[in-house]
Amino acid sequence: MTALTQAHCEACRADAPHVSDEELPVLLRQIPDWNIEVRDGIMQLEKVYLFKNFKHALAFTNAVGEISEAEGHHPGLLTEWGKVTVTWWSHSIKGLHRNDFIMAARTDEVAKTAEGRK
């Protein structure tokens, strides 16, 4: 468990600061195996989780949905047979905010107890 898993998301408005170049490597070290992807000029965090079948992948998707609703911050989720791709970014600032790293860490916590992980 990291400090990020204990933190809570804050309201993120259009004028909220992006994660700085100095903060980025520090935060990334706390969420191993997450990748930075840039789509349409927007930096995002992304990770693929593998499962034994679609049922387990769907259950994980729903569990991520539950923690997302609780924090009011929602990812991109692509659920496929045996695989869930989770993508975090802050829509309002079109980039990465500390909230995205908090939720990536929490997603990893959910994955630790998810049934049917490969």
From Swiss-Prot:
Any one GO molecular function term: 4-alpha-hydroxytetrahydrobiopterin dehydratase activity
The keyword Metal-binding is annotated on this UniProt entry: no
Record keywords, A-Z: Lyase, Tetrahydrobiopterin biosynthesis
Record InterPro entries: PCD_sf, Pterin-4-alpha-carb_dehyd, Pterin_deHydtase
Entry keyword Lyase: yes
EC number(s) recorded for this UniProt protein: 4.2.1.96
Catalytic reactions of this protein: (4aS,6R)-4a-hydroxy-L-erythro-5,6,7,8-tetrahydrobiopterin = (6R)-L-erythro-6,7-dihydrobiopterin + H2O
Enzyme class: lyase
Regions that span the bilayer: none
GO BP term (any one): tetrahydrobiopterin biosynthetic process
Assembly with partners or alone: Homodimer.
NCBIfam families assigned: PRK00823.1-1
PANTHER family: PTERIN-4-ALPHA-CARBINOLAMINE DEHYDRATASE-RELATED (PTHR42805:SF1)
Family: Belongs to the pterin-4-alpha-carbinolamine dehydratase family.
General function of this protein: Involved in tetrahydrobiopterin biosynthesis. Seems to both prevent the formation of 7-pterins and accelerate the formation of quinonoid-BH2. May also have a positive regulatory role in the expression of phhA.
Protein name: Pterin-4-alpha-carbinolamine dehydratase
